[in-house]
Amino acid sequence: MPSSTSADRRVILFDVDGTLVHAAGAGRRALGRVLVSELGQIDHALSGLRLDGMTDRLIVREVLDTLGHPFDDALCDRLLADYVEALRDEIGGPGFEVLRGVEPLLGTLAASGATVGLCTGNVAEGARLKLARGGIDHFFEWGPDAIAGFAHDGEARERIVRAALDRGSARLGSPLHPSDALVVGDTPRDVSAARAHGVPVLAVATGRFSEGELRDAGADGVLPSLEGAAPALLAWLAGGRTPGVPA
């Protein structure tokens, strides 16, 4: 039974792409294959999009809008189901990497008994495939009761954060206060979605955005990477301040 103290109830919610792993374009290639198969020539509808921080459902909507194709949920569901199958092939390609400091950090958090989850724009199986490629999927729980938010929870990233908080509350048996969650991400969209719910954000400059850009976006704390971040995150779990906050 979880302790009722705030510190023991704290939860760290990780983004996936650009935060934990770099998938070397596997997701973009997989979705491109599916869109071509379903819709024919898509020209530059996908290549012209900045996907950082977008949910998979929003990416599909944006591509369909660019092509002048009507959006409907059934089509989106079908495209994303096919995308997962294509991703199984693409994720094994070259260039994939687990970002520096991630595996030892997750190992330290697991050994400490920390509660961690995912807050990602990926569909759940897409996230699992990416983390499994890097051998780090076992650090997270999967299934309907896992503390997580995924693309199936909504197009808007704010809804994904809300879903993760709600599942955290269900798991803990009482409401998870936003200040007792910490989103770790690498894009301004991660920041704005979390802040919309009052959740503090640790941003890491391991994706496309610099430390300055992430700080300007409103991140509570910013680090160059997750390398060496374990002590600061353990301190936050024990009731301390958000890692990466300027002294």
Predicted segment positions?
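Substrate-recognition "cap/lid" segment bordering the active-site pocket of phosphatases
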Residues: 123-182, 188-197
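Helix-loop "lid/cap" segments that line or gate small-molecule binding pockets
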Residues: 57-71, 164-167
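Membrane-embedded alpha-helical bundles of multi-pass transporters/translocases
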Residues: 35, 83-84
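Short acidic-hydrophobic, aromatic-tinged amphipathic segments that line or gate anion-handling sites
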Residues: 149, 221-226
